[in-house]
């Protein structure tokens, strides 16, 4: 696999030099300064690409070309944003970039309630606390009909949790959930956030699928024409939240996805940390079944807690994910492609490392501190080498 690393551009506290020293060769990045929906010009793409190459690295994957909210709701200028998206793909292809990761999550990107959950060893991780999230929905946001999403026991627990919160706790939880995360343009006040949610109140999962299908049928033929692989990222967490439709969460969703738009350019980002939150997702089976459509891998593990809807991000080779067999399946697919003359390795990045060691004293992007990902990348490098020696390079 190609060892890659997410970089948030020139303002990222982790420099390109740091990344090269970590052993990565590919950069996963985006033009975060360009507003969602606007065309990425060839000039801007080349400028970023040159910056990366001057550091001895290559721009391996775009993550992400954001999908404008009006595309997701099919309102306003959605056709304009789709046409802009097509032009961005053409421009990326002209600059030699061949893989684009994106998501179709409504309103929010990945969602956590705690961005600095302290583990027993003193390192810090991202965490999603189901009851804390319920307290936010029911008593802070006060989302209409939110009680329908929770049973009586959960509602009582959420009330108890909320009653113990200080004003500072409320502010911090709200900020964690709605203020936006690295790489995301959106950041909302509570009122603005509810307004965004209201735009989806009449969009069922079935209707939302028709919106995704329309987007795929517009975009994927262009990607196929210009030689770009589109790699959709799953919902994170992979279940409905905030009354929003979530439609990239299960193996059944993956099957619908490839049947809806069967062109080879239409593929997946295998994010083990997102899919792996659900105990009913068999990650090895998912990887094997859709191996020929996996164009990018986010390798990360999560640990479900006593409440199975609560989880925290585990060390990369620990937790609930069968990382050994997932990586083995990815390597099996990579060797199949190589035997058919495809030289493009599957780009892989260590996702969401723990904040640890010297990074505990630094300001870092949540989940994207250097040392935790350095550790994860080294572990995956070792796992890959061992798998190759035992199973592939006999």
From Swiss-Prot:
GO terms for biological process: D-glucuronate catabolic process. SUPFAM superfamilies: Xylose isomerase-like. It catalyses: D-mannonate = 2-dehydro-3-deoxy-D-gluconate + H2O. Its EC number is 4.2.1.8. Disulfide bonds: none annotated. InterPro entries: Man_deHydtase, Xyl_isomerase-like_sf. The keyword Nucleus does not apply. Pathway: Carbohydrate metabolism; pentose and glucuronate interconversion. It comes from the Bacteria. GO terms for molecular function: ferrous iron binding; manganese ion binding; mannonate dehydratase activity. It is an enzyme of class 4 (lyase). Keywords: Iron, Lyase, Manganese. Its cofactor is Fe(2+); Mn(2+). Catalyzes the dehydration of D-mannonate. NCBIfam families: PRK03906.1, uxuA. Belongs to the mannonate dehydratase family. This is Mannonate dehydratase. It comes from Haemophilus influenzae (strain 86-028NP).
């Amino acid at each position: 696999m190609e060892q890659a690393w997410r970089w948030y551009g020139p303002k990222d506290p982790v420099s390109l030099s740091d990344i090269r020293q970590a052993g990565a060769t590919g950069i996963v990045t985006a033009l975060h300064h360009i507003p969602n929906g606007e065309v990425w010009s060839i000039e801007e793409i080349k400028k970023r690409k040159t910056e990366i190459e001057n550091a001895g690295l290559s721009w391996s994957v775009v993550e992400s070309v954001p999908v404008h909210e009006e595309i997701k709701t099919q309102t306003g200028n959605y056709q304009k944003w789709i046409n802009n998206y097509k032009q961005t793909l053409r421009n990326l292809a002209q600059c030699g970039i061949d893989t684009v990761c994106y998501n179709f999550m409504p309103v929010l990107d990945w969602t956590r309630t705690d961005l600095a959950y302290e583990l027993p060893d003193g390192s810090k991780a991202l965490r999603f606390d189901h009851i804390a999230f319920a307290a936010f929905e029911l008593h802070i946001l006060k989302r209409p009909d939110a009680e329908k999403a929770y049973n009586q026991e959960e509602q009582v627990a959420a009330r108890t949790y909320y009653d113990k919160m200080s004003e500072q706790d409320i502010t911090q939880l709200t900020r964690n959930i709605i203020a936006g995360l690295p790489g995301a343009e959106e950041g909302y006040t509570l009122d603005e956030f509810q307004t965004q949610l209201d735009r989806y109140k009449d969009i069922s999962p079935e209707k939302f699928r028709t919106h995704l299908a329309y987007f795929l049928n517009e975009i994927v033929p262009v990607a196929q024409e210009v030689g770009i692989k589109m790699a959709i990222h799953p919902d994170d967490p992979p279940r409905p939240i905030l009354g929003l439709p979530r439609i990239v969460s299960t193996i059944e969703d993956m099957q619908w996805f490839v049947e809806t738009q069967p062109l080879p350019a239409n593929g997946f980002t295998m994010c083990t940390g997102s899919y792996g939150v659900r105990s009913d997702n068999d990650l090895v089976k998912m990887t094997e079944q859709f191996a020929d459509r996996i164009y990018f891998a986010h390798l990360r593990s999560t640990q479900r807690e006593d409440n199975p809807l609560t989880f925290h991000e585990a060390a990369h080779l620990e937790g609930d994910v069968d990382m050994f067999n997932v990586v083995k399946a990815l390597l099996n697919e990579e060797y199949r492609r190589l035997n058919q003359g495809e030289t493009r390795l599957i780009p892989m990045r260590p996702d969401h490392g723990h904040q640890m060691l010297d990074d505990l004293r630094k300001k870092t992007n949540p989940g994207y501190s250097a040392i935790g990902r350095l550790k994860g990348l080294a572990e995956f490098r070792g796992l890959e080498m061992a798998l190759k020696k035992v199973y592939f390079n006999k």
